[in-house]
A protein has these predicted regions:
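N-terminal secretory signal peptides
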Residues: 1-18, 26-32
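C-terminal motif of bacterial Sec signal peptides marking the signal peptidase cleavage site
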Residues: 36-37
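Secondary-structure end/capping motifs
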Residues: 250-335
Length: 358
């Protein structure tokens, strides 16, 4: 059974409460007050109009801030008459908000959870996946002073997940299957990722499974360590994918192609050298993007360097099929969905990684 656990439900002493406030302060941007204002016309449908791209302040979305800034700089070097595209990042507090904005057409593009896009497309929402945004980047965290050395030792323990729709939950299920365990062997609670580090510190949960930087926040603070990481267990892990509405594909395919090129270029650039990752941290930590403590994002980039990767953004059909089957087994997708229903490979096949100069 999956229970929802809110931060008001976590019983902590005064010291733990103060520690929670510190951790949440470091990650304040992960709970933004709202999205940047963007009307229905801000999707980049008109010539010369910026394309608003929704995303969350998580490292799985790091290629997006890099792409936005790099494109703005390259526009300044274009000769008169050359097509200019502009991309504007819009920060959201959670996947439901991104989903609603994309469904309503308030935004035309966003980084989304891959299984969620599959489900939306199956329900006739006109959206398509056009690129990956990253690989890997999920962790299962336990307290540093806990006795847990193997995943099986978590049997009977309370483990937090963002939601049953999150790909992190599929990662947890893969680890259960690896040990011949089922979700019935543990106690699963749903919890907002920004609350997870404090909940672990307060012993309100025994472990949590989520994406970065919420694992790194507790690890850097010294009271948590990763028990399992996708880099070791599921290297081709896919969570966030670049998704666009079909009317944008139909009305401005050149813009979609350029955006895919920019994201691909950002991924290559991020994985080329550590210096580039540090530059990306400085960009993403700013108020226009994640608005987070740069030390935590930098920790994700270095410990280890392949904790999250961006250089291999190939869209491989078999990987999406595996993700779908895992989602069906988890009950978040009800039936098999044709690959072509949610995927448009055209832009990835024609992609040329943009040169990133930052």
């Amino acid at each position: 059974m999956i229970w929802r656990l809110c931060k008001q439900c976590i019983a902590v002493d005064e010291h733990a409460l103060n520690r929670r406030r510190v951790v949440q302060g470091l990650l304040a941007a992960a709970l933004p007050l709202g999205t940047l204002s963007c009307g229905k016309g801000s999707g980049g449908m008109a010539t010369g109009e910026p394309l608003v791209v929704g995303g969350l302040p998580v490292t799985c979305n790091l290629t997006l801030p890099v792409a936005c800034v790099a494109k703005a700089r390259s526009n300044g070097a274009l000769a008169a008459g050359q097509p200019r595209f502009e991309y504007r990042y819009s920060k959201y507090s959670g996947w439901p908000e991104v989903k609603e904005s994309l469904m309503a057409g308030r935004i035309q593009a966003a980084y989304m959870l891959a299984p969620l896009v599959m489900d939306l497309a199956d329900r006739k929402v006109p959206v398509k996946i056009v690129s990956l945004g990253h690989r890997s980047g999920a962790v299962i965290m336990v307290r540093t002073d806990s006795p847990y050395q193997t995943f099986r030792q978590l049997a009977g323990k309370q483990i937090a997940i963002p939601s049953r729709f999150a790909v992190d939950f599929l990662f947890l299920r893969k680890m259960l299957a690896q040990e011949n365990m089922t979700p019935a062997d543990i106690h699963i609670v749903e919890m907002a990722p920004p609350d997870m580090p404090a909940a672990l510190y307060a012993n309100a949960v025994d472990a949590y499974c989520t994406g970065e930087p919420f694992g790194a926040a507790a690890q850097q603070a010294g009271y948590a360590r990763p028990l399992r990481m996708t880099r070791d267990e599921w290297r081709n892990y896919i969570c966030c994918v670049l998704t666009v509405r079909e009317e944008l594909i139909q009305q401005n395919p050149a813009m979609v192609q350029d955006l895919v090129n920019q994201v691909l270029g950002a991924g290559v650039w991020l994985d080329q050298r550590q210096e580039n990752r540090s530059k990306a941290v400085a960009i993403a930590a700013g108020r226009d993007f994640f608005n987070q403590d740069p030390k935590i994002i930098q920790f994700v980039m270095e410990n280890p360097v392949d904790r999250v990767t961006y250089g291999d953004l190939r869209m491989i059909r078999a990987e999406f099929e595996e993700l779908m089957q895992l989602s069906i087994a988890a009950g978040t997708i009800k039936h098999a969905i044709a690959y072509e229903t949610y995927m448009d490979e055209t832009f990835a096949k024609n992609a040329r990684a943009a040169a990133i100069s930052l």
